[in-house]
Amino acid sequence: MARGNDIERVVADNRKARHDYFIEETYEAGIALTGSEIKSIRAGQVNLRGGYVRIVDGEAWLYDVHIAPYEQSGAYFNHEPTRPRKLLLHRREISRIAGQVERQGYTLVPLRLYLRGRRAKVEIGLARGKKLYDKRDDIARREARRDIERALKERTRR
């Protein structure tokens, strides 16, 4: 039987990041949140599109991720929807990531946000931007794969 902290539920997925970037490596990080933010996350009110991660003074910060204000709380107790949020990583992970981001053309993007037990986690990816022709190649490969699967499906029907 699975314990409560083993259950993982994906709250938000950043499919646009996988379309716009080549993901080289992924890391799991915790997030420092307020009470109304975690309640909104549990309600699924999160948008990762356009978000990015920066390393500032040896700390990882998540920017431009929209967590909607919690509906049941008053205006006084609510949070700012797109405020920077501190990511919780080990010091050696941060220094390793910072060294990799220093290289030309690499960035850190949030890939998905999920709940593991009672804790919110974000999967961040070390990414390199795709050019337009890379995106077209991906689309052509996907369409070719669909055509092959369609042909095989028709062949097995006979």
Swiss-Prot record:
GO biological process: trans-translation
UniProt entry keywords in alphabetical sequence: Cytoplasm, RNA-binding
Gene3D superfamilies xref list: 2.40.280.10
GO MF, any single term: RNA binding
GO cellular component: cytosol
Subcellular location field: Cytoplasm
UniProt cross-references to SUPFAM superfamilies, sorted A to Z: Small protein B (SmpB)
Main location: cytoplasm
Task performed by this protein: Required for rescue of stalled ribosomes mediated by trans-translation. Binds to transfer-messenger RNA (tmRNA), required for stable association of tmRNA with ribosomes. tmRNA and SmpB together mimic tRNA shape, replacing the anticodon stem-loop with SmpB. tmRNA is encoded by the ssrA gene; the 2 termini fold to resemble tRNA(Ala) and it encodes a 'tag peptide', a short internal open reading frame. During trans-translation Ala-aminoacylated tmRNA acts like a tRNA, entering the A-site of stalled ribosomes, displacing the stalled mRNA.
Annotated HAMAP family: SmpB (MF_00023)
Similarity-based family: Belongs to the SmpB family.
NCBIfam families: PRK05422.1 (NF003843), smpB (TIGR00086)
Name the record gives this protein: SsrA-binding protein
